[in-house]
């Protein structure tokens, strides 16, 4: 059941025409031992299926770069919330992460990252406290 919900969430990371949003370049700034906490994030296979047992590579370094390949904006109590698929490489092997971020302001018109100009976008990603590993990892994201 949860697997089906995960797969549905992954497939919802498309725009109205059914194509992937992006790609947008981004820099993932890892702070507060975020590399360890990223192991709690589910991975998405290249085929778009969720693999709840997959773990991101441990050697993600602060300032690691990747490509945001899709976003799925959702309206929540705290504003716009989005599922972001983040693609990077580990030893030359592509791997895609999925993590949930509250967009909200200061993004224009409460738009998601997908609506920002498709240029190099620097993101400062830090965990939202308190961190609860029992729920989907949530990170605050703001453009710089």
Please identify what each model-predicted range represents:
Residues 1-144:
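Intrinsically disordered, low-complexity segments enriched in small/polar residues
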């Amino acid at each position: 059941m949860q697997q089906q919900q995960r797969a549905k969430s992954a497939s919802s990371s498309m725009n109205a025409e059914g194509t992937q949003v992006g790609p947008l370049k981004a820099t993932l700034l890892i702070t507060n031992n975020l590399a360890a906490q990223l192991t709690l994030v589910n991975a998405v296979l290249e085929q778009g299926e969720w693999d709840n047992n997959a773990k991101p590579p441990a050697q993600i370094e602060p300032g690691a770069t990747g490509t945001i390949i899709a976003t799925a904006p959702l309206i929540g109590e705290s504003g716009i919330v989005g599922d972001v698929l983040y693609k990077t490489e580990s030893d030359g092997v592509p791997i895609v992460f999925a993590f949930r971020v509250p967009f909200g302001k200061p993004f224009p018109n409460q738009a998601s990252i997908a609506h920002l100009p498709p240029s190099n976008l620097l993101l400062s990603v830090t965990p939202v406290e308190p961190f609860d590993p029992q729920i989907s990892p949530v990170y605050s994201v703001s453009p710089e």
